[in-house]
């Protein structure tokens, strides 16, 4: 049936309900019980005493008009409701509206700011009662019980005023006390499972009317059935609507508000368990935890600097010190279980600086270049261990003489990770007390393992073990990368005066051996805190993923204790200051370039003016040691031209005089 076949009155009713469909409303019920006072029966229909109140009289006439008009339009049946009951319903309708208006005045609310619906009904057991739905933006759920008490007071006062039974002043006071104490005005509530208290329950205004009130039948026989007498509302949509149109409005509203798809949900036994109320303190702690994890706070000092407000708030609470400690422990546990050390470092990379970042000239790679190593290979191996992809080789060992850069590299990595636990050699009984729930374990200046060798081997291989903590029970250490620096040979284990050679090879199998022997100059400085995040980002950008499968793809095999970090060599060429495009291209794709190297301008001048003593020496062997890396191995680069070949090409194009004059001009 199309929409134009319905009356305008029906469509207006549907639209009005849809407009207020999701408005939350209070649900009140007014009633009037039969009572007996000193032998005098006061029934529900004994409140029709005439009163000189023009406003009340006008409201009664409006209710009478609405009831008479709806009955005239219903031709299928004839109402058998007696006139006394009708008159009483009309009076009650006026009294209820009067109570509502008095509440609005007490709360300084304009009546036109409220939406209400009133329906008088008759029940076989309950008798007469009236449902009232009330919605206003100025009324909050917390005021529901106060509204009920106010309406109950006004309702009892008006009932005493309009009672047609001849009562003494004492009996009138008693009637009012009964009405208030027995709660002749109630509000819809629900009982909480935990607190066992009643709380006001809000209903959806439009849904409640369409699904519940409009589906009820018109009352015909008060003694035989239940139904409604009269409905009125603030929008004047259902005051004069007949019974059939009310059902039509309910049907149309239900069809239009029906969801397009109905999702079937399966409730598990765990979900059906009784819920638990979260206190404000719990909610505050959870919000603080989310902030701490998002900002990677791992120490009380970081918390004081990054989240001072939440730190002070918790510190001021009873038991604040323990609360701070436990909250921080949950934060570090979350980071340790959900992130790897490599991921924490990679998060801190500034992508705006990555474009101009030169890996070869970073301080870390300068240290590796002093040893003639393939610095990309070394950084790639370290990244795999930090990402927990090194397998049993779970420890990066920097060892060698003093002042060779071991500690500054380890310190830079530890600072970039943040969530780091330190081994305490001075605490003989509990050396790993600080190493639980960490993303990296830092062992500075490691010495003889002694009786702790088995515990060291388990941690260095990335096993899950339990350790003892001071003043606490044992605690589990999950697989955690280890970074270690030392000046000694840690593969030699001494227990007392006895050397234990059976531990040498197992220790080597667990270490990524990086031996630094070149002493750094005094002005070398520290590694910048932004360097290692950029190194990790550079590796990812250029295809060096931090997995052992990717490592073996690039370098042929997994690293060993005696790994030759110099192979495969990185071809370094002599790049003139004017060849910036070539330098950028080589740095952006270290494995795909195949360049013929070009000598610097002064070298070309010397080549042009003087004969070469070593005509068969390739250019690559006399390249400047400070040129940028090209990222390719010897086997990937074409054979470099010899000096004699370059001489022949130049002399074929230029004469000696022209070549000398041109290059002299450039140098001047």
UniProtKB/Swiss-Prot annotation:
Region (Ori-binding): 193-197
Catalytic activities: ATP + H2O = ADP + phosphate + H(+)
GO cellular component, one term: host cell nucleus
PV NS1-Nuc domain mapped to chain residues: 21-260
Residues forming the catalytic site: 212
Classification via Pfam families: NS1_C, Parvo_NS1, PV_NSP1
Co-factor binding comment: The endonuclease active site can probably bind other divalent cations.
Cofactors, names only: Mg(2+)
Subcellular location: Host nucleus
Modification(s) after translation: Phosphorylated.
Renumbered residue ranges of the record's region DNA-binding: 1-277
Keywords in alphabetical order: ATP-binding, Covalent protein-DNA linkage, DNA replication, DNA-binding, Endonuclease, G1/S host cell cycle checkpoint dysregulation by virus, Helicase, Host G2/M cell cycle arrest by virus, Host nucleus, Host-virus interaction, Hydrolase, Magnesium, Metal-binding, Modulation of host cell apoptosis by virus, Modulation of host cell cycle by virus, Nuclease, Nucleotide-binding, Transcription, Transcription regulation, Viral DNA replication, Viral genome packaging, Viral release from host cell
Residue ranges of domain SF3 helicase in the record: 367-529
One Gene Ontology term from the biological process aspect of the record: symbiont-mediated perturbation of host cell cycle G1/S transition checkpoint
Binding-site positions, ATP: 400-407
Residue window of motif RCR-3: 212-216
InterPro entries: Helicase_SF3_DNA-vir, P-loop_NTPase, Parvovirus_NS1_C, Parvovirus_NS1_helicase, Parvovirus_NS1_N, PV_NS1-NUC
Gene3D superfamilies membership: 3.40.1310.20, P-loop containing nucleotide triphosphate hydrolases
EC number: 3.1.21.-, 3.6.4.12
Quaternary state and interactors: Homooligomer; when bound to DNA.
Its job: Multifunctional protein which displays endonuclease and helicase activities required for initiating and directing viral DNA replication. Also plays a role in viral packaging and transactivation of several promoters. Binds site-specifically to 2-3 approximate tandem copies within the origins of replication (Ori), unwinds this hairpin region and nicks one DNA strand thereby initiating the rolling circle replication (RCR). Cooperatively binds Ori with host PIF and probably other host factors, which activate the nickase function of NS1.
Homology family: Belongs to the parvoviruses initiator protein NS1 family.
UniProt domain comment: In the N-terminus, the endonuclease region is involved in binding to the origin of replication. In the middle, there are the ATPase and helicase activities. The C-terminus probably contains a transactivation domain.
Descriptive protein name: Initiator protein NS1
Taxonomic placement: Viruses, Monodnaviria, Shotokuvirae, Cossaviricota, Quintoviricetes
